[in-house]
From Swiss-Prot:
One example GO MF annotation: pyridoxal phosphate binding
Protein's UniProt keywords contain Lyase: yes
One matching Pfam family: PALP
Family matches, as InterPro entries: Trp_synth_b-like, Trp_synth_b_CS, Trp_synth_beta, Trp_synth_beta/beta-like, TrpB-like_PALP, TrpB-like_PALP_sf
Protein name per Swiss-Prot or TrEMBL: Tryptophan synthase beta chain
One cellular-component annotation, GO: cytoplasm
Described purpose of this protein according to its UniProt entry: The beta subunit is responsible for the synthesis of L-tryptophan from indole and L-serine.
This protein's UniProt keywords: Amino-acid biosynthesis, Aromatic amino acid biosynthesis, Lyase, Pyridoxal phosphate, Tryptophan biosynthesis
Length: 417
């Protein structure tokens, strides 16, 4: 029989986990680029609502999930933990492989977890319009869905290469009421600085979104990754995963998730950091593209989160704000930087990181689709590629990874491989 672990809604976590409460060190604060001193909350209020800024700096271990957010989560959560038995048999490995499947969400990825929370907190703060960026379109789809749930207008700058590669993502965003523009665009002074054939980057799209917010009343910026409060909302993944593993008596040797800005990886990994700190033998691995290796080849220093330098300076692993990654199909991982939390954990060697090639990614994705019956998003297939390498060794009892989304909007990528 297929081994699947489902939680009842009543068993779903009713709180988010804040890893900042348990870390034995402080994060370096975001800096105001004008003064190189810690940025004032007043400046951040120009782009973020107060409730989310409070979460950004909170040291409370657990943050209650509001009832309206839980109500929306009930549409698709808790998500299943599944044993990949067909993959195990194919690899002839003694290692048990489990995956936490986030592709059952309304838009097909983990991004909805924070989109719903951010839409709710913006709504109660009086925001009328949310402006954001998106790479592969997963985040833009999620925020469009969440925005219409809470009566907010949503405007999206989508990285141009992904806008061209993934036309059905645009249709989905439009279906949920989102207004989507390719970035660089001619709508902002920042976008107009780039040539028409520029592929775009998440850094440029972020700049265009923030520029729009700063020039529009009742609009706030919404980010789908990197920031503390985003990873906080995503910890519902790891908290559920922990409960599900306890039910079947599995103590994972390795926990794996793909890494771009850090939302999926952080959400999966952070609830297990207390176990690492207490000395338990768990290896936690962030897997990124070889062509955009922020953690494995980046520098740990202060840098802007966007190309134009409109964000505060953040201490993180970075390839540089002007880095233009190749036009790979995993658009959600084409980011020059990384979450400050994930960066600090990696710097302190509490987590590991690895990179894989696009060829390895699509080989793994195709294999997983044939064996397990789910076409993984190219981003998620990075984790699968790493898991396959590790499972072939056969020296671990169990590996758990997060399948952060399905790839049914990314089939063009599979055709071209």
């Amino acid at each position: 029989m297929r081994e699947k672990v489902y939680l009842k809604f009543e068993e779903m976590p009713k709180v988010y986990y804040n890893v900042l409460a348990d870390l034995p060190f402080e994060l370096d604060p975001p800096l105001d680029p004008e003064t190189n001193k810690p940025i004032s909350p007043e400046k951040l209020l120009a782009i973020f609502p107060e409730p989310l800024l409070e979460q950004e700096v909170s040291k409370e271990r657990f943050i209650p999930i509001p009832e309206p957010v839980l109500k929306e989560y009930a549409v698709y959560r808790p998500t299943p933990l599944v044993r990949a038995t067909f993959l195990e048999e194919y690899l002839r490995t003694r290692t048990k492989i489990y995956y936490k499947y986030e592709g059952v969400s309304p838009t097909g990825s983990h991004k909805v977890n924070t989109a719903i929370a951010q839409a709710y907190y913006n709504k109660i703060a009086g925001t009328k319009t949310l402006v954001t960026e998106t790479g592969a379109g997963q985040w833009g789809s999620a925020l469009s869905y969440a925005g219409q749930k809470f009566g907010l207008d949503v405007r999206i700058f989508m990285v141009k290469v992904s806008y061209q590669q993934k036309p059905f993502r645009k249709i989905l965003m439009n279906l949920f009421g989102g207004d989507v523009q390719p970035s660089p665009s001619n709508l902002t002074q920042i976008g107009r600085q780039f040539s028409e054939d520029h592929p775009g980057t998440l850094g440029i799209a972020i700049s265009e979104a923030i520029h729009t917010v700063l020039n529009e009343k009742d609009a706030k910026y919404s980010l789908g990754s990197v920031l503390n409060h985003v990873l906080l909302h995503q910890t519902i993944i790891g908290l559920e995963m922990k409960k599900q593993l306890e039910i079947i008596g599995i103590k994972p040797d390795i926990i794996v998730a793909c890494h771009g800005g850090g939302s999926n990886f952080g959400g999966s990994a952070l609830p297990f950091i207390p176990d690492v700190l207490s000395g338990k033998n768990i290896k936690i691995v962030a897997v990124e593209p070889e062509s955009c290796p922020s953690l494995t080849k980046g520098e740990y220093r202060y840098d802007f989160g966007d190309t134009a330098g409109l964000t505060p300076l953040m201490k993180m692993y970075t390839l540089g704000k002007d880095f233009v990654p190749p036009a790979i199909h995993a658009g959600g991982l084409r980011y020059h930087g990384a979450s400050p939390i994930v960066s600090k954990l990696y710097h302190e060697r509490l987590i590991d990181a690895a990179s894989v090639t696009q060829e390895e990614v699509f080989e793994a994705g195709k294999l997983f689709a044939k064996l397990e019956g789910i076409v993984p998003a190219p981003e998620s297939a990075h984790a699968i590629a790493y898991v396959i390498k590790e499972a072939k060794k056969g020296d671990k009892e169990s590996i758990v990874f997060t399948l952060s989304g399905h790839g049914y909007f990314d089939l063009n990528a599979y055709i071209n491989q």
